[in-house]
Amino acid sequence: EDIVKIIRSVPPGNESSMTTNGTLLGSLAHDLRKAGLARVNISLDSLNPENYKSITGTGLLSDVLEGIQAARDAGLTPIKINMVLLKGINEGEIDDFIHLVSGDRHLILQIIELMDLGGCPLHADLSELEEKIALHSRKVITRRMHHRKKYCYEGAEIEFVRPWHNSDFCNHCTRMRVTSDGKLKPCLLRDDNLVDIRGKRGEELQRLFLAAAKKREPYNK
């Protein structure tokens, strides 16, 4: 309920972006843009309404598609569509997602590999798919920070996110995450260096943020 207020409170000169499921963007996109939000990433793992509901457990696919349009209209671009490939669930929807972003310069498709923690049955290796896309791409751009490739394929811009296979992704990470139970998480792949910030304010909260930042180090060192 207070997301617009939070965005508005970000000091000038700092770019704000947001990853969202997109279900409320239809009504909030323009207010978020006015508040200073620059762009959005939208998590969307299926374009099939029944499949979408099965994956998310709630919400309507139509709300997300409306949110994508609203974000485009509000200028929250480029919009990255984050699709996590799930084995046996949405593997057959790749062409549908490519069609969704094809020909739209404001949309980028990010196909994300699910982390294979302990032999997850939903994990799907992206190697073969990326090789296929690379082979038939009109143009390939290598991003400087993570050395991640962007493929211009059938009118679509496509990126593959595979942190397990890209040490540069880890070495150049600038993220600090907050867990659902109020802990700072310096590294996506670790749970042994969390910093509890529940109930903390002011200088104490600032001190804990700095302490968490000092715990940051490449996971693959």
Residue ranges, per PLM feature:
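Short, ordered loop/turn segments at secondary-structure junctions
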Residues: 114
